[in-house]
Amino acid sequence: MLFAVIGHPIEHSLSPLLHKISFELMKVEAEYVKVDVPPHRLGDFMSSVDMIFNGINVTIPHKVEVLKYVDVADDLVNEVGAANTLKIKDGKIYAFNTDVEGVRGSIKDAVDPKGLKVAVLGAGGAARAAVVALRDEAQVTVFNRTLEKAKRLAEELGVDYAGLNEVDKIKKHDIIINATPVGMDGVSMPIPPDVIESRHVLMDMVYRPLYTPFLKVGLAKGAKTVNGLKMLVIQGMESEKVWLGASPYWRDVYERLLASLA
């Protein structure tokens, strides 16, 4: 069996290593590769996937655009408006979204979100997954630099919204999720450090670096932190359930992946 992750750029992806560890744990004979697909090549790539791959993970910037090329999308894909997992069977392409469970599982490993106030920073695809993951149990507010974009997302998904500069509002939340790329450079923060308090639970959807400045400040202040690698592993195991009907316990894969990166 052959699986792949597609995106652009893709060289930073840890998905091949993650799935290699998982396949070895399950004693599954399969390969997992990364394929750099620039946006203008997506159509060409998708036209031949059914002859090559059993399943595909989709990352930035293709999670929305790829929906043009699938035959069947599940309800969650339609709700989020994006897919990160494709299953190819009998010449048909089926689309799924496991990012939602990636967020939900990561947060629930740290805290029960029921009834808590959640601030989601950002209004892109990652933010959509975070909102859908938590809106049924928690009070979710989308904070974004461009207020109009936050408004559109919030109204579509039935949650509140505010500007990213409204830091006093952000501070009043229990869980703060960074769903922006800010912090990938190892220097930048999506919000000022003084917004973060010890009572907060912080999650960063960025997984490289493993501890972004956002999470480092949280750790220094005694806040609970959830790194993006945990989400990557949980969504990856959910993808394997789609493809193979089973997956190892995510924590076993997570610990092995952490050790291999040390």
Swiss-Prot record:
Keywords: Amino-acid biosynthesis, Aromatic amino acid biosynthesis, NADP, Oxidoreductase. NCBIfam families: aroE. The active site is at 63 (proton acceptor). One of its GO terms (molecular function) is NADP binding. Belongs to the shikimate dehydrogenase family. This is Shikimate dehydrogenase (NADP(+)). It catalyses: shikimate + NADP(+) = 3-dehydroshikimate + NADPH + H(+). Involved in the biosynthesis of the chorismate, which leads to the biosynthesis of aromatic amino acids. Catalyzes the reversible NADPH linked reduction of 3-dehydroshikimate (DHSA) to yield shikimate (SA). The keyword Secreted does not apply. Homodimer. It comes from Ignicoccus hospitalis (strain KIN4/I / DSM 18386 / JCM 14125). NADP(+) binds at residues 75, 122-126, 144-149, 205, 228. PANTHER family: BIFUNCTIONAL 3-DEHYDROQUINATE DEHYDRATASE_SHIKIMATE DEHYDROGENASE, CHLOROPLASTIC, SHIKIMATE DEHYDROGENASE. InterPro entries: Aminoacid_DH-like_N_sf, NAD(P)-bd_dom_sf, Shikimate_DH, Shikimate_DH-bd_N, Shikimate_DH_fam, Shikm_DH/Glu-tRNA_Rdtase. The keyword Amino-acid biosynthesis applies. It comes from the Archaea. One of its GO terms (biological process) is chorismate biosynthetic process. Its EC number is 1.1.1.25. Pathway: Metabolic intermediate biosynthesis; chorismate biosynthesis; chorismate from D-erythrose 4-phosphate and phosphoenolpyruvate: step 4/7. Shikimate binds at residues 13-15, 59, 84, 99, 207. Pfam families: Shikimate_DH, Shikimate_dh_N.
